[in-house]
């Protein structure tokens, strides 16, 4: 790894000059230690369950990285194309003036990340915030989405974005749900994971705790004893939790037995189900805060 020439690449931020090139490192190989978070670490290693203080995630894209920085998340490094450093990425670097920056030829960067580079391309390895407990995120919540066994990161990300846009207060995730900090999930949600409080549940997907806290619990499923999500009694519920199930098998039988009601979206043309992210968007819209 090589340092680029110093004394150049300065940008003006809030009336002060910030040197960029003094902290830019040129990578020559995927073996360079500085790019290990972007290439060598598996999702499980990024979670670092044994040492939570070392857990990281990857923010991708200028908007997502900026949102993370504005929310106070701690960047450990940046990885970006050379033209971004003094171009569109300059504002990002000025927001974190001492964080190391890594760059290199496009073929090296593509080998590191495993995908083709876009024009405005930037990644940042960031420290994960401390995890919250279900009790913490539910304390003042009135509308909660519960994700059970949803394994596709893009679906998790899409649901986070919908929940943020429609004003839902919190999200709970079962132990077998995809990690909300997965790079693809963070990208799809456009940083909503930074703004919507969330927590992992126990094996019961939190249904016991939600019931004890007075939530009206509703599971989405293809059952005859269901109601539409625009049901007036659901809209008027003071505290409501909507359970969304696995892409292939839906909610567990035990979860549905624990739910007070079952929701089913009416459909036409002999279509019986939607992608879980699409179904979530409809249900969360119909049951959004203040709709009753």
Predicted regions and their residues:
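Boundary-proximal intrinsically disordered activation/regulatory segments immediately upstream
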Residues: 15-84, 178
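RNA substrate-binding interface of SAM-dependent RNA methyltransferases
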Residues: 20, 70, 101-103, 126-225, ...
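Glycine- and other small-residue-rich loops at beta-strand/loop junctions that grip anionic moieties
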Residues: 27, 57, 148-149, 174-175, ...
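Amphipathic alpha-helical repeat scaffolds
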Residues: 61, 151-159, 274-279
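Short, aromatic/basic amphipathic alpha-helical patches
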Residues: 87-98, 255
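A glycine-rich helix N-cap at a beta->alpha junction
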Residues: 97-114
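Structured adenosyl-cofactor binding patch, chiefly the S-adenosyl-L-methionine
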Residues: 121-123, 162-166, 180-192, 253-292
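Active-site/ligand-binding-proximal alpha/beta "capping" segment
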Residues: 219-271
């Amino acid at each position: 790894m090589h340092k680029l020439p110093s004394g150049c690449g300065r940008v003006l931020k809030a009336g002060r000059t910030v040197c960029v090139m003094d902290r830019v490192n040129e990578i020559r190989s995927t073996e360079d230690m500085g790019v290990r978070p972007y290439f060598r670490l598996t999702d499980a290693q990024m979670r670092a369950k044994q040492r939570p203080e070392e857990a990281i995630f990857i923010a991708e894209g200028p908007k997502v990285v900026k949102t993370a920085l504005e929310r106070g998340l701690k960047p450990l490094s940046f990885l970006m194309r050379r033209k971004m450093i003094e171009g569109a990425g300059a504002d990002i670097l000025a927001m974190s003036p001492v964080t190391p920056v890594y760059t290199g030829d496009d073929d090296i960067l593509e080998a590191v990340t495993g995908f083709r580079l876009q024009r405005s391309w930037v990644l940042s390895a960031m420290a994960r915030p401390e995890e919250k407990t279900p009790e913490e995120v539910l304390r003042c919540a009135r509308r909660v989405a519960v994700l059970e066994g949803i394994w596709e990161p893009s679906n998790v990300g899409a649901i986070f974005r919908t929940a943020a846009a429609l004003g839902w207060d919190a999200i709970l995730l079962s132990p077998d749900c995809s990690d909300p900090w997965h790079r693809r999930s963070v990208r799809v949600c456009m940083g909503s994971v930074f703004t919507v409080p969330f927590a992992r549940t126990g094996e019961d997907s939190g249904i016991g705790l939600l019931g004890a806290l007075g939530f009206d619990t509703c599971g989405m499923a293809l059952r005859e004893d269901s109601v539409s999500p625009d049901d007036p009694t659901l809209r008027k519920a003071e505290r409501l939790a909507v359970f969304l199930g696995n892409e292939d098998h839906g909610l567990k039988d035990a979860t549905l037995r624990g739910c007070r009601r079952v929701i089913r979206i009416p459909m036409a043309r002999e279509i019986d189900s939607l992608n879980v992210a699409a179904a979530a968007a409809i249900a969360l819209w119909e049951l959004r805060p203040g709709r009753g």
